[in-house]
Amino acid sequence: MFYKIAQKFMFQMDPELAHNFAIGSLKSTGNSPLNCFYAQKIKPAPVTMMGLTFPNPVGLAAGMDKDGECIDAFHAMGFGHVEVGTVTPRPQPGNEQPRLFRLKPAKAIINRMGFNNKGVDSLVENLKAVKSDAMVGVNIGKNKDTPVELGKDDYLICMDKVYQYAAYIAVNISSPNTPGLRSLQYGDLLDDLLGSLKQKQKDLTEKHGKYVPIALKIAPDLSSEEIEKIADSLIRNEFDAAIATNTTLTRDGVSGLLNANEAGGLSGKPLNSLSTIVIKQLADCLKGQIPIIGVGGINTAADALDKIDAGAQMVQIYSGFIYQGPQLIKDIIEAYRIK
């Protein structure tokens, strides 16, 4: 009830302004009695994945809390994990505004944010300040002005700095809003990146006495052959998980709607079937050797179960959370429990 009132108010605002307002509000109330307006008591439905035990299978996807400012608030809502970021080595403003658009009739969002964030050092300070026992994944990327062929260095810098504070690390090479980034999903560039990250993981495990799993986040706009090659590289480099999928450049299901022709990645309900197809193809290629977190267009509990049936072990929500509110978390967990 409270969320529907808040949503009505925020949907009158510019999308990015509304997002910033929400983050500011959650940041200030996450550990105060005021979190009673959104906190939910949810019966555990544990999932073991990547050698970690999560309290339930529903996580917050990266992009909502880029700088890790509201981890305790999202944990209070009942998320089984919170993925913060995407974070880059240096702060960057992202792309020019406007860069975030609602397509309300389709329950969709288009964004071309461009990894706007305060930098990895700021994120680390926020991770240190977390008071709850939230499972936090950190999604890492490269700075826009770092050449693609040197992008590996940015990922290694971020990994080094967040390692001891993260439950797991997600490697984002699939955002459509950083020029050239998606080229890292292919061939020698992918193998070199994954191999270097795996070696870094081994070094940091020895240094900190703690094994932090690493996952790769992929795009939905891939051919069957490309998915097969990515799966092969994940297996050969012994990655701990895959996250499927990021936003899409396609516009299926939104043609003719206001803002549908804006540049950027499409998320929300129209992405659901495409991301589920990719999850199924990826799962078939991985043959149970590497687990999958399914994300993309989940708007109902049934959507989440479809992704689990397709081969995902856990799911994440973002756009569906914007449109449906915290109740979606509870709905998915309850459906998962009785499945």
Curated annotation (Swiss-Prot):
This is Dihydroorotate dehydrogenase (quinone). Its cofactor is FMN. It is found in: Cell membrane. It catalyses: (S)-dihydroorotate + a quinone = orotate + a quinol. Its EC number is 1.3.5.2. HAMAP family: DHO_dh_type2. It is a peripheral membrane protein. Catalyzes the conversion of dihydroorotate to orotate with quinone as electron acceptor. Monomer. GO terms for biological process: 'de novo' pyrimidine nucleobase biosynthetic process; 'de novo' UMP biosynthetic process. The active site is at residue 175. Keywords: Cell membrane, Flavoprotein, FMN, Membrane, Oxidoreductase, Pyrimidine biosynthesis. Its main location: membrane. Substrate binds at residues 66, 111-115, 172, 177, 246-247. Binds 1 FMN per subunit.
